[in-house]
Regions:
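Sec-type signal peptide cleavage vicinity
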Residues: 2-12, 21-306
């Protein structure tokens, strides 16, 4: 390496180095400005909120995306509201092939700054950006079959947004989050329960409204005000563990909430409850030999559950 003394003694060398650095900087600026936005294809990296989980045994559809899953994508001007049409990208379906997400046709950038909005599962025909109807399944015990999602996965609406983006060869990150609420129920054998407790049961969540309206720009689910309260069949995660996706809402009056049916016996728990958006609510249900003496323990909340 040339010392400062040597550089001073050889001003030609120093001047050459300065010119070289300036030349490199000019080339980088030239590359950035020479990017043709309209000829630059969009690419994306997609992250499922459950991707960081390391469970011992969990179905892939609950913790990550699977091959042939589809997300809906909008790309709109950063200084304009998202519209049902007229954006740079309008509800394009991106399909996962097991390694990357690709649209049916190549999507290209344009000049300017944009915001990207994405949701899952994909809805083929949207009717609104601010009030898109959406329903969670009332039978979330069903499993994926062919191209049809299971009841639980079809109910777990995910949303992602990335703002202030422009034409680039770098992929746009889409980090999804849950916008519904989740109730996880763990069945625990009480001290006075005789014999072995069955590893499977029918578990219901009563008196919630399964219909919602979705704001696809804000990523917010709101209970449909004219919706009717219904019962939801929970999904079995493991022995004694069940869960259900619930539209965010408040049950203000005490009423039947959780019912467990095992060996022909019904265990019913009544309560008020607030289902918060993006929150997993954990409850332990203590099963007694006497169905009238069922007890519950609130196990806490997990924000932005994985």
């Amino acid at each position: 390496m040339l010392s400062r003394r040597h550089l001073l003694e050889h001003p030609c060398i120093a001047w050459s180095l300065i010119l070289g650095l300036a030349s490199c900087g000019d080339e980088n600026l030239q590359d950035a400005h020479s990017l043709d936005a309209k000829s630059t294809p969009m690419t994306f990296t997609v992250s499922h909120p459950g991707k960081k989980l390391t469970p011992k045994n969990t179905r892939a559809t609950e913790t990550d995306f699977e091959k042939n899953d589809k997300i809906g994508l909008f790309v709109a001007k950063a200084d304009s509201p998202l519209e049902i049409g007229g954006n740079l990208v309008n509800n394009a379906a991106l399909t996962y092939d097991g390694g990357k997400w690709t649209p049916a046709h190549t999507l290209y950038w344009d000049e300017g700054t944009y915001n990207a909005y994405a949701y899952y599962p994909y809805i083929n025909k949207l009717s609104s950006i601010e009030d898109q109807p959406f329903n969670v399944s009332t039978d979330q015990s069903t499993h994926k079959s062919g191209t049809s999602l299971g009841g639980y996965e079809a109910s777990d609406l995910l949303f992602a947004t990335t703002k202030g983006i422009a034409a680039s060869t770098a992929p746009v990150p889409l980090n999804f989050k849950h916008i519904m609420s989740k109730l996880t129920i763990r069945l625990i054998k009480g001290e006075d329960f005789e014999g072995e407790m069955p590893t499977t049961a029918a578990v219901y969540v009563h008196n919630t409204v399964p219909s919602a309206t979705i704001d696809l720009q804000a990523g917010v689910a709101t209970r449909y005000m004219k919706g009717y309260r219904q019962s939801i069949i929970a999904h079995q995660d493991d022995n004694y563990i069940y869960s259900a996706i619930i539209v965010p809402q408040r049950i203000e009056n005490r009423m039947p909430l959780i019912e467990v049916v095992m060996k022909g016996v019904s265990y019913l728990f009544e309560s008020k409850f607030q289902f918060k958006p993006g929150t997993e609510h954990l409850v332990n249900l203590i099963i007694s030999d006497n169905p009238d003496q069922v007890k519950i323990e609130i196990g806490g909340e997990i924000q932005n559950w994985q």
